[in-house]
Amino acid sequence: MTVPQMIYLLSDATGETAEKIVNAVLTQFRDKPVRLRRISNVRNRPAALEGLQEAIKNQGMVVYTVVNRELAQYIKDECEVRGLMAFDLVTPLLSQFSQFFGRTPGQTPGLLHDMDEEYFRRIEAVEFTVKHDDGQEVSHLRHADIVLVGVSRTSKTPLSTYLAHHGWKVANVPLVLGIDPPKELFQIDPKRVVGLYIDSQRLVELRVARLKHLGQDPRAAYADIEEIEEELRYAKLLFRKQRWVSVNVSGKALEETANEVLVKLNLK
């Protein structure tokens, strides 16, 4: 059995960024068995030396992401003295940026990790929102940051998607006249629920356009003004009864509606 070659990732934060970059490069060497060993929070010489000694023991390569120039230089010097192959992922780029911006860089460790955390938080929010669109998986409503409720064509899905891309886990539940909403909707904190409504005439226009797009008769009950007004009365009554905050989406851009939702839920 072939023994995998070791690559040590020394980082002043978690090492996630270095690991992603190294793994991307390793896709070009799929025939080589490799093992990555992350050594996090390397912010002083003793911590760096401890990682290097392990690399020496296993004849590994060292890849490091350290923003402190003195510590990065120390790692470089020690690797040269000890015969370790090493690569600095950060210093060359910092130097180029310094020339480009005409100023010296800050040396705050962990900022790349903070960016990664924010990125993955948004990805997780989008994945959650897609799975909980249009009344899907209502058993998980309690895990949502925001639950949007409204009759058909009140911008529930696009608004959910917009909020998700800003890091909020959103579920949306349609209200249909004559059909009871899922019981799970009444079991969650009402302070996380927002009722969406729209002007009746505007809703007629949206539904007629939808029916035409689907090749269906635009005179169907779905787009009937009396039917729509009854649906909206039912929805608004439910909002008041459950003490859910409500937002009129008529004539508003998604950004404006999203901001209003966050303000009314005290999330902004």
Curated annotation (Swiss-Prot):
Keywords associated with the record: Kinase, Nucleotide-binding, Serine/threonine-protein kinase, Transferase
A molecular function GO annotation: phosphotransferase activity, phosphate group as acceptor
Superkingdom to which the source organism belongs: Bacteria
Enzyme class, broadest EC rank: transferase
Catalytic reaction(s) noted: N(tele)-phospho-L-histidyl/L-threonyl-[pyruvate, phosphate dikinase] + ADP = N(tele)-phospho-L-histidyl/O-phospho-L-threonyl-[pyruvate, phosphate dikinase] + AMP + H(+); N(tele)-phospho-L-histidyl/O-phospho-L-threonyl-[pyruvate, phosphate dikinase] + phosphate + H(+) = N(tele)-phospho-L-histidyl/L-threonyl-[pyruvate, phosphate dikinase] + diphosphate
EC annotation from Swiss-Prot or TrEMBL: 2.7.11.32, 2.7.4.27
Residues that hold ADP according to the record: G150, V151, S152, R153, T154, S155, K156, T157
Keyword Magnesium: no
UniProt xrefs under Pfam families: Kinase-PPPase
Keyword Nucleotide-binding attributed: yes
Family recorded in the similarity comment: Belongs to the pyruvate, phosphate/water dikinase regulatory protein family. PDRP subfamily.
Known role: Bifunctional serine/threonine kinase and phosphorylase involved in the regulation of the pyruvate, phosphate dikinase (PPDK) by catalyzing its phosphorylation/dephosphorylation.
Listed HAMAP family: PDRP
The protein's name: Putative pyruvate, phosphate dikinase regulatory protein
Origin organism lineage: Bacteria, Pseudomonadati, Thermodesulfobacteriota, Desulfuromonadia, Desulfuromonadales
